[in-house]
């Protein structure tokens, strides 16, 4: 204990946790913000900050009012009568925890000072990648700790219990300072704190940020004090309020008006929001719903099926980086006052500068959706990726084009083929229907699939080396949006699947099959042997009449297949085992795994075409890319025009085999049956791979 306790010995120095936290905040500010952003942040913070004993800080009311978040009190209180969007207390608890980073175990809840606010903005926006060593994984741990509010012991008790064990290894605090520790300047930052990679191993969470501050030993001390953060849980009510806020603010654009999404919501809109929120909560285990959400369940849910859930926090907290009070023309205005002939400089508007809308625009034309609504679109944005550069569909300015609706175009495979097979771009298939339980009660269900390749006969996935980690936006996805949120990611071994396992299969005899094994064509194939068979982690079959859809989800893998089972992401699958090995290993898994089969009476079936923004199209326009130089809508219309001209040309064929009108109609009937003219020209076998 001798030398390590001395604060005056050679090679020793004393640094408080508070001082290190401030120094780290300044490092964050210099690394993650521009000088202009810092100027705006300082103006926003100090113009509203309270002062107590020389400490400038924000309280919950100031934070909620600035962000426009309902908090059950103040000006943002009267947003909804049921208070379901009153997430102000939840957000304030999160920022109070994150403001103490990386010493949240000894300092949290922290006072929301300017330094704390700097760290909060970095950690709650996409700037976190510059300071967290393991990026998204570390951020999930921090977010869980900031939300956990059930079963957490009092921090003072934890400090007292840890004091005796930590005294010798860290150094006893000097008189009058309960958070001052000593450590050697020659401490090796490469020395591991733990050898295991367990979920509770957070010791390297912020080592990269602290190495240059010579604060590694203090950080390790802080981490040893409270490993019980993973023993605490997130209450269902806390997570429900946060989900509701994220659901309504998902389309929020940078510098957009937050109140537009949180105020004036009708009861019908709130009902759709609650439906999607409860669907996500239903994906958790029953034990989580009763006693709170544990870290393992939270981490698995976010990493495997809701990777973009917290994306709305980025534009929300980046509002702090724009101040309405700053007038950059003020200096020029003061100089012009001495010149009588100079025109007065107009005052800037009180609202932030406008920016292009970022919500996926549902293009007009075709039909009005009976499935899509703002809440469901937000739900899709939490897990659906349409671009490698900017995965979130709200951020990358994806546009949705109405391609097919069974309500508008009829429940016919001929009509489906005419509208869908001519769409040369990615698409989303949505189905809304009812599942009848054993008690004859109908439960409304919404399922769908993301198909990154066009529906066309000659389509196939581009060749990919098995060592390559596939981009999520290039893999298909099968999902259930309600009543239980379920996501089945595309397999990273997709390129190595056999030809009889196409992503999508279309036949006028068997209907539509997604993620199924297709039996070889044979005249002897009758009954069940002729139908596509479910494979992999899940499959979807739709009958030729577009009346019944069968969703099959497997607990394991029914051999190799297009989709992975629920709870497994393509990234983790490709990381744990190579694509070739994964495909080979799945064949050894018994096909007797328990399958959950849902027979859904279809109320409505819709196909929506995905059109990337023009800027992303330029980036993605490369060999093997789905983006063509010609707009997908223009391509489809050109195809329809060509088919119409061909139909007109065929009409001039002399169908008069006799001299009477009856013979003319008979001749035309023969041509229609042959598929040369009429609607039947769209029938036949279509095979998508």
From Swiss-Prot:
<dbReference type="GO" id="GO:0005737">
    <property type="term" value="C:cytoplasm"/>
</dbReference>
<feature type="domain" description="TLDc">
    <location>
        <begin position="370"/>
        <end position="611"/>
    </location>
</feature>
<dbReference type="Pfam" id="PF07534">
    <property type="entry name" value="TLD"/>
</dbReference>
<comment type="function">
    <text>May be involved in a process influencing telomere capping.</text>
</comment>
<feature type="region of interest" description="Disordered">
    <location>
        <begin position="166"/>
        <end position="201"/>
    </location>
</feature>
<feature type="region of interest" description="Disordered">
    <location>
        <begin position="332"/>
        <end position="359"/>
    </location>
</feature>
<protein>
    <recommendedName>
        <fullName>Restriction of telomere capping protein 5</fullName>
    </recommendedName>
</protein>
<keyword id="KW-0963">Cytoplasm</keyword>
<comment type="similarity">
    <text>Belongs to the RTC5 family.</text>
</comment>
<feature type="compositionally biased region" description="Pro residues">
    <location>
        <begin position="343"/>
        <end position="359"/>
    </location>
</feature>
<dbReference type="InterPro" id="IPR006571">
    <property type="entry name" value="TLDc_dom"/>
</dbReference>
